[in-house]
């Protein structure tokens, strides 16, 4: 039997669709994107548990961030929240909310949830204590550790989400293609 015109003998890539509990239904009636679709910056989601790239009290590994966090923890938290939320929560909004909660003594209730999301995203252990305890007792150290962890995974929290996406796209454009040959 012959092949229709235009068809080649090359194997076609197979696409496997799996149902995922992370698919979200948006309130506007459409289906939201699954959480496992890339959103600009590739991140390795691993099921095995990794270790934090630095210890909780290693704040002087990034002394500039340690000083900023000591003086204005709301700035560091805002930067972390914007990256973890993939730009959905701007740094200023998260920082102001954190600052307001800080003066009530309840900022740990808001901030520990972002630590949990970082742990989940990078497969990190709930150590040295549960997230809420770490943020309640060691808040500035926890924020510094989370900031360093994001940097370890290639994010620059100072740039914000959009800046990190733009930087990743520029690096991708600068990377030469591999495995291509000239056909003659």
From Swiss-Prot:
Topology versus the membrane, per the UniProt entry?
Answer: Single-pass membrane protein
Q: Which GO terms describe its cellular component?
A: membrane
Q: Where is the composition biased (Polar residues)?
A: 1-26
Q: What are the boundaries of the region Disordered?
A: 1-33
Keyword terms? Membrane, Transmembrane, Transmembrane helix
Locations listed in the record: Membrane
Record-annotated membrane-spanning stretches: 94-114
Any single Pfam family the record assigns to this protein: PLAC8
Which superkingdom, per the lineage? Answer: Eukaryota
Report if keyword Transcription is assigned.
Answer: no
Show the InterPro entries listed in the entry: PLAC_motif_containing
Q: What is its main location?
A: membrane
Q: What does this protein do?
A: May be involved in heavy metals transport.
Indicate the family of this protein: Belongs to the cornifelin family.
Alphabetical list of NCBIfam families matching this protein: A_thal_Cys_rich (TIGR01571)
- Its name, as the record gives it, is Protein PLANT CADMIUM RESISTANCE 5
Q: Which organism's genome codes for this protein?
A: Arabidopsis thaliana (Mouse-ear cress)
């Amino acid at each position: 039997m012959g092949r229709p015109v235009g068809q080649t003998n090359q194997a076609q890539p197979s696409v496997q669709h799996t149902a995922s509990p992370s698919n979200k239904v948006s309130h506007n009636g459409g289906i939201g994107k699954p959480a496992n679709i890339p959103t600009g910056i590739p991140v390795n989601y691993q099921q095995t548990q990794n270790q934090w790239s630095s210890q909780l009290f290693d704040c002087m590994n990034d002394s500039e961030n340690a000083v900023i966090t000591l003086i204005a923890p709301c700035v560091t938290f805002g930067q972390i929240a914007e990256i973890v939320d993939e730009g959905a929560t701007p740094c200023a909004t998260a920082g102001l909310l954190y600052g307001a909660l800080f003066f009530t003594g309840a900022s740990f209730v808001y901030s520990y949830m972002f630590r949990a999301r970082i742990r989940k995203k990078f497969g990190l252990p709930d150590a040295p204590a549960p997230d809420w305890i770490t943020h309640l007792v060691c808040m500035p150290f926890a924020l510094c550790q989370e900031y360093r962890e994001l940097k370890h995974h290639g994010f620059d929290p100072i740039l914000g989400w959009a800046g990190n996406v733009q930087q990743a796209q520029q690096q991708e454009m600068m990377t030469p293609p591999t495995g291509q040959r000239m056909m003659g």
